[in-house]
Structures are given as C-alpha cells and as structure tokens.
Amino acid sequence: MSIRTGLIGLGMMGRHHARVMRSIEGTELVAVADPFGDKHGAAAGLPLFQTVEELIAHGVDAVVCAVPTGLHEEVGLKLAAAGVHVMVEKPIAENVEAGQRLVDAFDSAGLVGAVGHIERFNPALQQMRKRIESGELGDIYQIATRRQGPFPARIADVGVVKDLGTHDIDLTAWIAQSPFAEVNAKTFTASERPHEDMIVATGRLASGVITNHIVNWLSPMKERLTIVTGERGAFVADTVTADLTFYENGSVPTEWDALSAFRGVSEGNVTRYAFAKAEPLKTEHEAFRDGILGNRNAYVSMREGLDTLRVAESMLESADSGSSVHL
C-alpha cells in the first residue's frame, strides 16, 4: 500500500518537491496546498487547497512542508497533532525555541520528523563521507566550506546564516561525525533587510577538527565547495557539479626551483572520481520514505536540524558579541 503524501508550499522549492514526489516509488502525491495559489503549476491536476487543515482532511500519511521558515512551527505542530509524518525544509524553524517545540511534538507522537538538509544527499559529499569512513584520508584536520552566489530575492524571513549557512553547519558535523563545540563569526549586511548578507565563521568540533566557513549571497560568482584536509591529503567536493577530487600529499620531489615556489617542494597525484550521480532531492525523499517504513534512518532528523540551528544562532551571537561562543 502506497504512502499518501501531500505538499504544502508551492514556491521556488515547493515546485521541485512536487516534481520529485511524483517519482518516489511506494508513495503517491495526492494533494498540495498553498494559500497564495499555484503560480508554477505544480499541482498539475491534483487537488489544490489553501490550508494545512484541508490537506489533513483529504487524508495524508506524510507531508513535505515548504512554507516560509516563520510558518514551520505552526504548520508542523498541526501536522504532528494529526499524526502525519513531516519533512520540513531547512532550517527547522525560525529560532531554537520553536525548533525544540517541533522536536518534542514529533518525538511524543512517535512520528518521523525530518529536515530537508539536501546537501547531505549530494553524491559528491556522500562519496566523500564513505571514503573518509573507510580511512582513505586518515585523521581529519580541517573542514572548510565556501558557499557564495547572487542575492536570491525569494528569501525574506531569515538571513544568510540560517538560509544557506545551515547547509555547511550540517554537512560539516555530518562528514566529521562530530558536533560543533565552539564558533567565532563576523557578519556584514549590505541590503536594507534586517538580516545579515555575509558571514565568515571559524569553529572547532568536539573531535578537535577545526572549521572555517565563508557564506554570502553578495557574489556574482556561484561557488559551493567543501574541502576536507587530513593526514593523507585533501578531498574537494563541488556540490554544483557533484564532482569529488582527491589531492594526495606530495611524494615526488619538485626539482624546478621556480615551480616549487608556487607548488611546494613535492607533488602528489590528483584524482577526480567517477561515480553514479543521483539527484540529491530524490535521494532525500527516498530517505524520508524509508524512515517512515522503518527500513533505515538516513534522513536528517529534527533533532539534528535543531542542533544545526543552535550552531547558526551561536554564530550570530558571536558576531554580535565579538567573542567566541561555546556550545
């Protein structure tokens, strides 16, 4: 018997959810909802409702919540009370307090509560994590991320840290399999909005790994890089192209003095890996489905989403206070 799924929120991300949800084996997208209608044509003949109550009344087992961040708590709590499994877009909520209420509601109801931290499902990062787990990099020393691009007019209710930086917070802790212990950050605002447009942050994980993150939506150049440096070299994942490259530590002496000034005293092999590249959004939906069926727990839980939001708020606190924040 198929899982009856619904979608609330038909904006820029919601339309992509609608497309992918139609393709997930073992599920059936039965209805969608958005109080502002369906300007992207995502419903495509499905019942289109205005409220979450109407969506619940139609009969759904699971719902993807792609409404603005400020509405995550209200919509999520109504779905939890109705016994509906939910995957909410990231960040989990507008603030840690609201996120905690969502975690508590879904835990108490025994429901799957997931958060759409889609970067975990990027094939380049999944390959990287597998190779790190197998010991190919040895001990990890540092994780650095760069996430830059043009200003997205669609974002209005949160700043760049909660909208984009949460990607890097989540994937960093996930790759290292260690939570953040300390952060220090600086922010900059260029727009007339009340939120930050740029952040530069450093951190330390509980494992001792150091991190640094550059995130902004002020750059004309789109960049999505994760660099993990360890005792045997460095992995570089480009999540725009889903490419993974390994830079091996130098083993061959550089005899050309002028070249060694730029590249160092030795060189190692550089390998770009070939692997299957599934669409991250589809892989994310399959993980949500499998969690509902009890087959595996590869989805990002609301508790993990809450941890990520707590780190994001700690970065903002650090930027405001000018001091490091310990978690």
What is the role of each PLM region?
Residues M1, A62-V64, A287-L327:
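C-terminal helix-rich "cap/oligomerization" subdomain common to oxidoreductases
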Residues M1-A44, T172:
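N-terminal Rossmann-like dinucleotide-binding module
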Residues H17, L46-A105:
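Beta-loop-alpha module in the N-terminal Rossmann-like domain of NAD(P)-dependent dehydrogenases
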Residues V88, G113-V115, A237:
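Hydrophobic residues in well-ordered beta-strands that form the structural core
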Residues I118, R232-R303, V325-L327:
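C-terminal glycine/acidic-rich active-site capping loop/insertion
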Residues P152-M221, I227, R303:
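Rossmann-like dinucleotide-binding domain that binds NAD(P)(H)
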